C-alpha cells in the first residue's frame, strides 16, 4: 500500500455528527476539533435581544387584548366605566382559563401516575378487553388466564426494555467459511445481472447540462477573493468549487486557489500540480474573473493586520449566501481583498439560487481537469485493470481527456474480444478513521491501547471527551451503523451480493489498518485483488512518490472508471465525489453500491446463527433499496447527488 494520502479529510462526516447526537442528544461540532463557534466572533449576532423582544411581544399582545386600544380618547365617563367593566371581565376570564388549564394538567399527570402504579401493583395489562373464555373446568380456566396475562405482561416489559443487545467480538469465522464455500461452488454460475448495471431505466433520462449558461460574465470589480483550502485533495476540490460560487456571488475576482500543507497528508502539491490552470481560467471566464496572483499594489498588504483573513472559526459550516452578503461583502469593499483560510464546507447547499448552484456543478464536472501527467498514468491504470478492453466507458474522456482516453482503447483487440470487468472498492479503513470512530474491531487490549495513543496525538479534543464524558459504547455505535466496514465485513458484503470469485477487485485506500494480515480475508476469497501499486510499475509510480494527493487522484480515476463501484463508508468524500461523477457522466450504466451500514450491522450481529442463504437475501435486499434513482434531496450535496435541475436535465 502507498503511504497515507488525503483521499479523505479527518473523518468529520455526517456519520460522525450522529455520534454527537448519541452523546448530547443533538447536533454539534465534530469532536475532531474545537466547536465551530467557540463564542461570539466579529460576525456574530447577539440573539439575547431577539429572544427578549419576542417574549415582550407575546406579553404585550395579552395586555393589549385585556386593556383594549390605549390610543382611544374616552372623554365620556359612561364609556370609561363600560371600558373598565370590560377590562375587569377579560382579566377575570383570563385568570380563570389559566387556573383551569393548570388544574387540568395536574389532574391529567396525577391520573396517569396513579394508573401506572395501580397497573404495576396488579400486574395486569393496561388493555381492558382481556376476558377469559368460558371453560367447564374452572381451575384450568384460571390457569390459562393467568398464563395469558403473565405472558402479556412479560411481552410488554420486553418491548419496553428493548431486545437484549448482541455484542460484537470482532470475528466472522463462521460466515467467512460459508462465503468461501459459496464462492467455490458458484465459480461457474452467472452473477446477478444487477451487479454490473443500474437497476432503473429512469437513470437514462438524466443528461448532463451544467455547462449551459444564462447570465453575463462577472467583472469582479468589488475586489479579490483568495482561498487556502485545507483537508485532503477531495475536500480541497469541494472548497475550490464553493469559493468559485462565493466569488460570483460577491462580484469578486478569484485568485487561483492554494492548498494548505498538512502534517497528516505531508503533500506540498498546489492547484497547478493537480489541475490544469489555463483550462480552469478559460472555462469559467464566462462566469467569473480569475487571475493567477494579486495585483502588485495589494501584494504588500498585511491582510491579517487589516482584518482581511477569515478563518473557519469566523464562518459557520454550510453558511447561507446571506452571511456572505452581510459580513464578507462589506469587508471586501473596505479592504479590496479577503483571504479565506481552510474553507471546509463553508457554503450551504440550500437555499442557493439556481444559477449559482449550476455554477457549482459546472466547476466540479467541467472546469477541473487533471494535468496531463496524471491523466496519462490514470489511463495506463484503467487500461490494465480492464485487461486491454475494446471499449471506452462514458466517463473516460472526462477523466483522462480525449487524447489519453483513446490510449485505453486496445486497437488490436478484435470485435469478438470481450473486455474484462473490474470492481472498485474504496476501503476506508485507515487508522485515522478507525481511531476516530471509537469502534472496536476485535484486536483486544493492544488495539485499544494503540487507538487511544493515536487519538491523544491526532484527535486531542476527542481524546479529552472520552475521559470527561460518557461516550456511546462500541456496540451502540455499531448498532447505529457508525462504524466503518472492516475488510472482513466488506468481503462478506461482496460475497453476499454474488460477485464471483474470479472478479477483479481494485482496492482504493492507503495503509489499511492492520496491514496485509487484515486484508487476508479479502485476498483469500478474491485472489484477483489488486491496488495501484500492483498494477503500475515502480517507474510509473516514481513521479508521484511522496505526493499523496496525486496518488489519491489515481485512486479517484480508477474508482470512477470502474464497471461497478462499492463504497464502505457513505460519509467518505472520495466515495461521494466518485459516485456523483459516475452519475453525471455514466449515462445510467455505471452502478454504485452503497450499503446501509445500520441494516448491514444488524445482519452481521447474527453471524453466529444466520444461514448463508438468508444472509445473501438480506444483504441483497439492503443494497437494492439504496439503488433507487432519486432526485437530490434538499440540503444534500450536488457533488454526490447531481440528479437535480441545476446540474442535469431530465428528458422525461
Curated annotation (Swiss-Prot):
Transmembrane segment boundaries: 91-111
EC number: 2.4.1.-
GO biological process, one term: fucose metabolic process
Residues given in the record as substrate binding sites: 426-428
Annotated compartments: Membrane
Residues bearing glycans: 139, 169, 251, 464, 546, 607
One cellular component term from this protein's GO annotations in UniProt: trans-Golgi network
MF term (GO), any: glycosyltransferase activity
UniProt keywords, alphabetically: Carbohydrate metabolism, Fucose metabolism, Glycoprotein, Glycosyltransferase, Membrane, Signal-anchor, Transferase, Transmembrane, Transmembrane helix
Membrane topology recorded in Swiss-Prot or TrEMBL: Single-pass type II membrane protein
Disulfide bridge map: none
Family (UniProt): Belongs to the glycosyltransferase GT106 family.
The protein's name in its UniProt record: O-fucosyltransferase 15
Organism the protein comes from: Arabidopsis thaliana (Mouse-ear cress)
Amino acid at each position: 500500500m502507498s503511504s497515507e494520502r488525503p483521499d479523505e479529510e479527518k473523518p468529520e462526516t455526517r456519520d460522525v455528527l450522529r455520534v454527537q447526537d448519541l452523546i448530547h442528544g443533538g447536533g454539534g461540532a465534530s469532536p475532531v476539533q474545537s466547536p465551530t463557534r467557540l463564542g461570539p466572533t466579529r460576525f456574530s449576532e447577539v440573539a439575547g435581544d431577539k429572544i427578549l423582544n419576542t417574549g415582550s411581544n407575546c406579553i404585550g399582545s395579552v395586555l393589549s387584548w385585556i386593556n383594549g386600544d390605549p390610543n382611544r380618547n374616552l372623554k365620556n365617563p359612561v364609556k370609561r366605566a363600560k371600558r373598565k367593566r370590560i377590562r375587569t371581565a377579560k382579566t377575570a376570564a383570563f385568570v380563570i382559563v389559566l387556573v383551569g388549564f393548570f388544574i387540568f394538567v395536574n389532574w391529567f399527570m396525577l391520573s396517569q401516575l396513579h394508573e401506572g402504579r395501580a397497573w404495576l401493583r396488579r400486574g395486569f395489562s393496561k388493555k381492558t378487553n382481556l376476558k377469559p373464555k368460558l371453560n367447564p373446568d374452572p381451575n384450568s380456566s384460571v390457569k390459562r388466564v393467568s398464563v395469558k396475562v403473565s405472558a402479556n405482561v412479560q411481552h410488554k416489559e420486553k418491548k419496553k426494555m428493548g431486545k437484549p443487545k448482541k455484542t460484537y467480538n470482532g470475528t466472522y469465522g463462521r460466515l467467512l467459511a460459508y462465503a468461501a464455500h459459496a464462492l467455490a461452488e458458484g465459480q461457474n454460475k452467472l452473477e446477478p445481472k444487477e451487479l454490473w448495471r443500474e437497476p432503473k431505466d429512469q437513470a437514462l433520462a438524466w443528461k448532463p447540462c451544467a455547462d449551459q449558461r444564462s447570465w453575463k460574465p462577472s467583472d469582479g470589480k468589488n475586489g479579490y477573493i483568495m482561498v487556502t483550502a485545507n483537508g485532503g485533495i477531495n475536500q480541497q476540490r469541494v472548497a475550490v468549487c464553493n469559493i468559485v460560487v462565493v466569488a460570483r456571488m460577491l462580484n469578486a475576482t478569484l485568485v487561483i486557489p492554494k492548498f494548505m500543507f498538512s502534517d497528516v497528508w505531508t503533500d506540498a502539491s498546489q492547484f497547478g500540480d493537480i489541475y490544469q490552470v489555463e483550462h480552469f481560467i478559460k472555462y469559467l471566464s464566462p462566469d467569473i474573473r480569475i487571475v493567477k496572483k494579486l495585483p502588485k499594489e495589494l501584494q504588500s498588504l498585511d491582510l491579517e493586520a487589516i482584518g482581511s483573513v477569515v478563518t473557519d472559526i469566523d464562518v459557520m459550516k454550510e453558511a447561507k449566501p446571506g452571511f456572505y452578503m452581510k459580513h464578507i461583502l462589506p469587508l471586501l469593499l473596505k479592504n479590496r481583498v479577503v483571504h479565506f483560510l481552510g474553507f471546509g464546507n463553508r457554503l450551504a447547499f440550500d437555499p442557493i439560487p439556481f444559477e449559482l448552484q449550476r455554477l457549482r456543478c459546472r466547476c466540479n464536472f467541467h472546469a477541473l481537469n487533471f494535468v496531463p501527467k496524471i491523466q496519462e498514468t490514470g489511463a495506463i491504470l484503467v487500461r490494465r485493470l480492464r485487461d486491454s478492453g475494446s471499449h471506452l466507458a462514458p466517463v473516460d474522456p472526462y477523466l483522462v481527456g480525449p487524447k489519453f482516453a483513446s490510449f485505453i482503447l486496445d486497437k488490436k483487440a478484435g470485435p469478438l474480444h470481450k473486455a474484462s470487468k473490474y470492481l472498485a472498492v474504496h476501503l476506508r479503513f485507515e487508522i485515522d478513521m478507525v481511531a476516530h470512530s471509537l469502534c472496536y474491531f476485535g484486536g483486544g487490549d493492544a488495539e485499544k491501547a494503540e487507538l487511544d495513543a493515536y487519538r491523544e496525538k491526532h484527535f486531542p479534543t476527542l481524546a479529552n471527551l472520552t475521559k470527561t464524558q460518557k461516550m456511546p459504547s462500541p456496540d451502540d455505535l455499531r448498532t447505529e451503523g457508525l462504524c466503518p466496514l472492516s475488510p472482513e465485513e466488506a468481503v462478506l458484503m461482496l460475497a453476499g451480493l454474488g460477485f464471483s470469485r474470479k472478479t477483479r477487485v481494485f482496492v482504493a485506500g492507503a495503509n489499511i489498518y492492520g496491514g496485509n494480515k487484515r486484508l487476508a480475508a479479502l485476498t483469500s476469497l478474491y485472489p484477483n485483488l489488486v491496488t495501484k501499486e500492483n498494477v503500475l510499475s515502480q517507474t510509473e509510480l516514481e513521479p508521484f512518490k511522496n505526493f499523496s494527493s496525486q496518488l489519491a487522484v489515481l485512486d479517484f480515476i480508477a474508482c470512477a472508471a470502474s464497471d461497478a463501484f462499492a463504497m464502505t463508508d457513505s460519509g467518505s468524500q472520495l466515495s461521494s465525489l466518485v459516485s456523483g461523477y459516475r452519475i453525471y457522466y455514466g449515462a445510467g450504466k455505471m452502478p454504485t453500491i452503497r450499503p446501509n451500514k445500520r441494516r448491514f450491522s444488524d445482519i452481521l450481529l447474527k453471524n453466529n446463527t444466520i444461514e448463508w442463504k438468508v444472509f445473501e437475501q438480506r444483504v441483497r435486499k439492503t443494497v437494492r433499496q439504496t439503488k433507487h434513482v432519486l432526485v437530490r434531496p434538499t440540503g444534500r450535496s450536488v457533488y454526490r447527488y447531481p440528479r437535480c435541475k441545476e446540474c442535469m436535465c431530465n428528458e422525461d
